[in-house]
């Protein structure tokens, strides 16, 4: 099951931008846990976004 949590730091309409719009200007990190879960995180001044992908 995929889950996404978006915290918009400025305005709600800013959250409509896609992750591709932020990838080039933010810290884009991918980590994999020992249980197979993968975390994608984007963090910049406008948005903080975390996506967790769990292998089923």
Question: Model segments located where?
Answer:
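Structured alpha/beta or helical-core interaction and ligand-binding surfaces enriched in interleaved
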Residues: 1-37
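Short, compact, well-ordered microdomains
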Residues: 34-56
